[in-house]
Amino acid sequence: MPIHYAAWCSTTAKHGLVFPEDRFYALGGVSPFEVLRMLSEEQGIEIDSEAVTFQKEAKYMELIGDAGEIPEVMQIVRESHGRLPMAIASGGTHETVEGILQHCVIRHYFDAIVTSQDIVNPKPAPDTFLEAARRINVAPEKCRAYEDADMGIRAILAAGMEPVDVRDMLAAASR
């Protein structure tokens, strides 16, 4: 998520918006359109959320070369590949999700990708995860979902799935 935050900081600053790091992490998983709507409304600054989202996504794509795999998560993905259907359920856009998967050469591990552009109600609503389960033909109650943000954990629980907070995995790995 540090690359996302760098892209957000660069883009929001150009439009006079303030986006503190703690707020960024609190809104993790929320669609970029919704984040911008919230920030502009709270700060009384009018912006074109769609245009600014595309600017943020373009900045992210510039920075993507610095991205890498999360080893603890990729171990699970590699062990599960071919044994369990897997999907990505992201609050991001198609462009950024596909971009990072292609950059890390891991797109082939996933049977479906659902982004904020595929559903009506983004995280913390369960729609993103429910659509991912539907696309891989697995009942939600039989799904385990990995997430790195509080909003996403709430969405997983609302979908009736088992959540795994990858932040706990990362903290344990760094000890």
Where are these regions (language model features)?
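Alpha-helical elements of Rossmann-like donor-binding domains used by nucleotide-donor carbohydrate transfer enzymes
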Residues: 7-10, 34-38, 55, 75, ...
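Short beta->alpha linker loops
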Residues: 3, 27-31, 55, 68-72, ...
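Helix-loop "lid/cap" segments that line or gate small-molecule binding pockets
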Residues: 11-12, 31-45, 100, 133
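Asp-based, Mg2+/Mn2+-dependent phosphohydrolase catalytic module
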Residues: 78, 94-175
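Helix N-cap/coil-helix junction residues
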Residues: 17-19, 45, 105-106, 138
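Short, acidic loop-to-helix structural element flanking the phosphoryl-transfer center
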Residues: 62-88, 94, 98
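Metal-dependent phosphoesterase signature
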Residues: 18, 38-75
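Active-site neighborhood of HAD-like aspartate-dependent phosphohydrolases
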Residues: 1-23, 169, 173
